[in-house]
Amino acid sequence: MRVAVSGFKGRMGHEVVKTVLREADLELVAVLDHEPKEKNINEIVEFSSLDVPVFGNLSEMLEEIKPDCVVDFTTPKVGYSNTKTILEHGVRAVVGTTGFTPEQISELRSIAESKKIGALIAPNFAVGAVLMMQFAQKAAKYFPNVEIIELHHDNKLDAPSGTAVKTAEMMTETREFVKQGAADEVELIEGARGAEYEGMRIHSVRLPGLVAHQEVIFGAEGQGLTIRHDSYDRISFMSGVALSVRKTKELETLIYGLENILD
């Protein structure tokens, strides 16, 4: 498959480029960056042996290169517009950018289906993180008192993380509604109890040195249960990205969540 990478200078995008280069059945045909200084990726020392054009305009890249799939790891500010542009050009998309609303996902799915092309948006591409979300979904049926703590590097722009939101969404499918905390609790400092989602609390930590971590803490009379996943390196996401790129060939719709393509 001929693959283009959008946001290739970001930490995740850089790792995606290296992954595409490693995979025998994937070919890196273009990279995209906002206002790039380079015209070819070989102007970067690490990739000096390659011959891959660098673009600053997504539509121009799609029309000139015509890739089979675009992997997008950019920012929440442009993630939706990028994905819409990719799909409208009839190109498959794998998107790790977060911050999509349910309405935006629905609209993008309609475009994918009208074009009969596959696309996948995932808050997290680590298989371990997907298992964490599935385990939490199952546990929530028996432990409705639950809070989420997600921890990421201090350059992450959105909070809470897409993984935390997706986890909460999945738990609402099995969890009996319970509003966390005392009915008359008072926050001495605003926000001390975290964000609220369907009665659950979500807490976001941003610190240097972290990559991506999350724990889901359940409490009940006389017992507790904690489910935690840690990504110590961005390589942890790459098997999921490569799987998703290949899977888009079999799809004619947009899938939200890596768990929906795992056997």
Swiss-Prot record:
<feature type="binding site">
    <location>
        <begin position="122"/>
        <end position="125"/>
    </location>
    <ligand>
        <name>NAD(+)</name>
    </ligand>
</feature>
<keyword id="KW-0521">NADP</keyword>
<dbReference type="GO" id="GO:0009089">
    <property type="term" value="P:lysine biosynthetic process via diaminopimelate"/>
</dbReference>
<comment type="similarity">
    <text>Belongs to the DapB family.</text>
</comment>
<keyword id="KW-0520">NAD</keyword>
<dbReference type="InterPro" id="IPR022664">
    <property type="entry name" value="DapB_N_CS"/>
</dbReference>
<dbReference type="InterPro" id="IPR036291">
    <property type="entry name" value="NAD(P)-bd_dom_sf"/>
</dbReference>
<feature type="binding site">
    <location>
        <begin position="162"/>
        <end position="163"/>
    </location>
    <ligand>
        <name>(S)-2,3,4,5-tetrahydrodipicolinate</name>
    </ligand>
</feature>
<protein>
    <recommendedName>
        <fullName>4-hydroxy-tetrahydrodipicolinate reductase</fullName>
        <ecNumber>1.17.1.8</ecNumber>
    </recommendedName>
</protein>
<dbReference type="Pfam" id="PF05173">
    <property type="entry name" value="DapB_C"/>
</dbReference>
<keyword id="KW-0560">Oxidoreductase</keyword>
<feature type="active site" description="Proton donor">
    <location>
        <position position="156"/>
    </location>
</feature>
<keyword id="KW-0963">Cytoplasm</keyword>
<dbReference type="Pfam" id="PF01113">
    <property type="entry name" value="DapB_N"/>
</dbReference>
<dbReference type="GO" id="GO:0051287">
    <property type="term" value="F:NAD binding"/>
</dbReference>
<keyword id="KW-0457">Lysine biosynthesis</keyword>
<comment type="function">
    <text>Catalyzes the conversion of 4-hydroxy-tetrahydrodipicolinate (HTPA) to tetrahydrodipicolinate.</text>
</comment>
<dbReference type="InterPro" id="IPR022663">
    <property type="entry name" value="DapB_C"/>
</dbReference>
<feature type="binding site">
    <location>
        <begin position="96"/>
        <end position="98"/>
    </location>
    <ligand>
        <name>NAD(+)</name>
    </ligand>
</feature>
<dbReference type="GO" id="GO:0019877">
    <property type="term" value="P:diaminopimelate biosynthetic process"/>
</dbReference>
<comment type="pathway">
    <text>Amino-acid biosynthesis; L-lysine biosynthesis via DAP pathway; (S)-tetrahydrodipicolinate from L-aspartate: step 4/4.</text>
</comment>
<feature type="active site" description="Proton donor/acceptor">
    <location>
        <position position="152"/>
    </location>
</feature>
<keyword id="KW-0220">Diaminopimelate biosynthesis</keyword>
<dbReference type="GO" id="GO:0008839">
    <property type="term" value="F:4-hydroxy-tetrahydrodipicolinate reductase"/>
</dbReference>
<dbReference type="InterPro" id="IPR023940">
    <property type="entry name" value="DHDPR_bac"/>
</dbReference>
<dbReference type="GO" id="GO:0005829">
    <property type="term" value="C:cytosol"/>
</dbReference>
<dbReference type="GO" id="GO:0050661">
    <property type="term" value="F:NADP binding"/>
</dbReference>
<dbReference type="InterPro" id="IPR000846">
    <property type="entry name" value="DapB_N"/>
</dbReference>
<keyword id="KW-0028">Amino-acid biosynthesis</keyword>
<feature type="binding site">
    <location>
        <begin position="7"/>
        <end position="12"/>
    </location>
    <ligand>
        <name>NAD(+)</name>
    </ligand>
</feature>
<feature type="binding site">
    <location>
        <position position="153"/>
    </location>
    <ligand>
        <name>(S)-2,3,4,5-tetrahydrodipicolinate</name>
    </ligand>
</feature>
<dbReference type="GO" id="GO:0016726">
    <property type="term" value="F:oxidoreductase activity, acting on CH or CH2 groups, NAD or NADP as acceptor"/>
</dbReference>
